[in-house]
């Protein structure tokens, strides 16, 4: 774990970044302007934001992260970075955590669990857009289920060698 302020500065200038998430990614509390728009303006990059309030990682219907990623994001789009929000909605709804798979096969993940959905999203993004994948967590709040999700995400990070912007464990926030 490292503090967010110590992240290596790698420019996304003139790159295409996909953001997948729910209300935080959407910017719900800020008139639908989130950090994605800020990054786009600051770094002159193209941000594709696929965010719907109240949605989950687990595949439980047409607005789940997985369904929207498959159905609304162009697989032929050039993508330089894929960033996904670790949804608090899964924690609030007590979505099953599941297990980290030993497989890397897209079709082997249990997408009705948080771990399976995370791994599916990573595998799909890597196979479809051949780009780096990152997840970001929310800052700490009173939620044992979300704490377990963050713990699982950090283990998945080791398996898949993805980036994690870990606001949950960042004591500077």
Predicted regions and their residues:
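Membrane/wall-proximal cationic-aromatic binding patches
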Residues: 1-19
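Short, conserved loop/helix-junction motifs that constitute active-site signature segments
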Residues: 10-12, 76, 126-129
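Conserved SGNH/GDSL esterase-like catalytic core that processes O-acyl groups on lipids
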Residues: 13-18, 24-108
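Short hydrophobic segments within beta-strands
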Residues: 20-21, 136
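Soluble non-cytosolic domains of exported or imported proteins
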Residues: 30-34, 108-116, 143-147
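A generic structural signal for well-ordered alpha-helical segments
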Residues: 39-40, 125-126, 156-157, 162
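Generic structural signal for well-ordered alpha-helices
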Residues: 118-122, 150
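Substrate-gating cap/lid alpha-helix
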Residues: 131, 136-172
